[in-house]
């Protein structure tokens, strides 16, 4: 019998056992207690990181050092000696990044990282088979995502041109090699070392250096060019509270119902032989749903930690509320109430979806995208047979769902009632399909999963294959033709009634993640939406209601169909516009119009806030200057009044008479002729007092003039000069 190596002891947790007493008290295993202690500590440390270690107060080096130090401490506390792998994998990959040619660095890093991860997966499977204890493979899976995505971003930035990149690839491209401190801080930062989510390198560096709140983020990887306007930093408090409360609710639901629907009972002979088909489907659906709430709890808490440190801001919604979903891993309600597999996949493990899209789906021929994406996802999870059964089944049902949607959906869009019926029906079907496809993922075993599938009579497998290969021969679905502008589709129903069936829509064909090729038109160019402006969009329309339809031509994958460019716009063909918003690059682009609207709303919100600040400064400066000028005028009026009674005099002295000429003239005159004019005998009685008063007022006026001349330009130039 194989004996486990020193750093892997069978049925033995290697992390700290300091809080064993607390684990016994609350009824949880010590590994889960350690995990919760670290995450709760990270939540409070994140607040300190955002406030006391704000980029305006400390250097980026200090922020990097603090983040990676706390991350390493958490890793050692939770995993003990196994934490050596947290250091080993990224260290080897960093050597590869620094030594290999950028033309092949992405492949080399992917090979090294996946090989290291698979070795650890294999050792865990050999020496701790079927264990659900917290182990080192979880953090290693996140680290693998980080180092491989960084390598591909370096390849995109150093080797490929902008015209070859998708919108997301342009945004994440890195053209400056990371230093050792930046690299290891990115890999080990405490916010995501235990449970994710995946943060792309560029987003993390901009967050640490304080550029993540700039109104005009750079479109390339040169993070050191930073003369840009800073917007007001929004508070993440509401988002953090909402996600922490949601995490607690999900933890309660998991603890409450996981004992009612234990997954292990599905392997028992009594369940397989003595229960009805309907109950089997119901139990599979409920058991997998309960397990999902464990992931909801971990992901929501991890997202709250990132938000509390200031990471994750993406702009404002239509009501002006700040949005903190840049790196969110889950949308619970959107997933649980999704009406098709595409929406379900897009809202589950979003960080991994973005990673798979970046590494695989956008870089391989379109016809192989789904298969290769599911294959990498399965290998990344490990060697348990249940993973491969789930992803193989998922690939089949995803393809069937896309075909079925094309065949049937348009038939239910005539009235509001039929649309509602279709949505409810597809929501229920999606729930059943998810339970059917994902129970092998939690069972892990091959034979147990196969036996249960046979008890299901492979119903959904058969229905999926029939939907893919047989139904299209008998049922005519929607036919799609590309419009002349390259951005829209014309849907043609198979019924032949073009008046009622023809509808125009703008749909994204960018690569969807983790097998998300549910875009119903395979012939659409998935990079077409990456062009912000194209010459075809500038051509005059033939009429206000006229749509020109072109027959689709066969083209290789990733080839754009372009019209002849106009002479006045040759530059638009040469270079694609960089993305202007982080959200454009990280979101799964179902709908490009929605992405453009979000970017526009963010820009409008920032402009509105900036305008309010400018108006406030204008008002403040105007009132200040007006007050100073009025004070000056008042003093001048006092000086130029015709009479001024001086102390000790018997009467008023004329200060603006024809023979006096005012206080200034009298002062000057008294200096030059020493008061010999008989017409000024009264004034000559007190020449020292008069000279002192004039000198004092003259000095005050000169000081005020100097203040006005210096203060007004200084105030106006303090970020407010037009």
Curated annotation (Swiss-Prot):
Its main location: endoplasmic reticulum. The keyword rRNA-binding does not apply. Pathway: Lipid metabolism; phospholipid metabolism. It comes from the Eukaryota. GO terms for biological process: germ cell migration; lipid modification; phospholipid metabolic process; plasma membrane organization; sperm individualization. It is found in: Endoplasmic reticulum; Membrane. Residues 485-511, 549-570 have a biased composition (Polar residues). Its EC number is 2.3.1.-, 2.3.1.23, 2.3.1.n6, 2.3.1.n7. Belongs to the membrane-bound acyltransferase family. This is Lysophospholipid acyltransferase 6. The lineage of its organism: Eukaryota, Metazoa, Ecdysozoa, Arthropoda, Hexapoda.
